[in-house]
């Protein structure tokens, strides 16, 4: 087992009192991949997670992370736009970005880690003609044919060396669900700061480690997310780069929405020593919850097969914690993303199916992976006339 004291915090360099939250070998190096055969899934590349929480600034990171194990290709699929709840969240965040620019001012938008440009395009759509330029950065981008007029995406990581690719008139910088994938937090924060200028506002969205610990959401620790922030730790990191920020909880507490800017006067954020109670709460509750779920699976599968609903990151981790080559209490995983159906989850090899297929397999228990989607999933099950028992993880 790794000693947490041997792991200096990447943000504040603290080594005193750091807490080892979770250590798991043989986890998939990528979550959001759907493999065509079970053999491919079982042989998928693996890594180790060693999740450590800083006792000083509360940052959580994977001390065993190796970026060489991460390689995004055409099998990567993190599309969750089949959820009305998530689409409403995207709309709300896009509207916040638009509202940050006065109504009589054109929007010149920049996005760092823009993926296929989906959020960029959404902001353009909802800005109703106000967006006059859009600049994105993402090395995996392939969607030129889907970009709105006036948009350009550079297929490279953004760094202080290519600030000249940002138009001088840019007034909004956005980076959603990128920072948690970056192990070199100091260099990435330097790049974010380099993108700033007087009159620009930066928006960052990323998971909140406090929510994970408070809800004992052990399924939210996985290899891709090597850097998980709290309100305190993101303030400290950005302050080190001369930025001040406000942090708000969004997505029913699972994410943070960070609004950063250049301060009018120099300032700094001192880490507030974080109580270890939250981490200890997580450790104790995790042991109890794992035991309870093991018993629950034994009881329910004696009646009928059990399925998870949610074939994204949470479902991949949860299935891996309970399914093995020797025992598979989880029969299958349901996902509305048609591109995943008929495929298999990395490492666990659990099959991904449509709701209709799960029903036809005789599934009698459905466990919802994300409580945010409970209402729409329950409605879907009712409309199918399916009498499955429903349980909600972290609900």
Regions found by a protein language model. Give the residues of each.
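N-terminal juxtadomain amphipathic helix
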Residues: 2-85, 249
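Conserved catalytic loop of SAM-dependent methyltransferase domains
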Residues: 23-31, 220, 248-266
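Acceptor-substrate binding/catalytic loop of class I
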Residues: 38-43, 218-232
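Short acidic/His/Gly/Ser-rich catalytic and metal-binding motifs that mark active-site loops
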Residues: 70-71, 211-214, 268-269
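Class I SAM-dependent methyltransferase Rossmann-like catalytic core
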Residues: 77-88, 280-287
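Conserved SAM-binding loop
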Residues: 95-216, 228-243, 260-262, 316-317, ...
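Hydrophobic, well-ordered beta-alpha structural blocks that scaffold small-molecule cofactor pockets
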Residues: 96-97, 122, 257-395
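General small-molecule cofactor/ligand-binding pocket signal
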Residues: 135, 154, 246, 353, ...
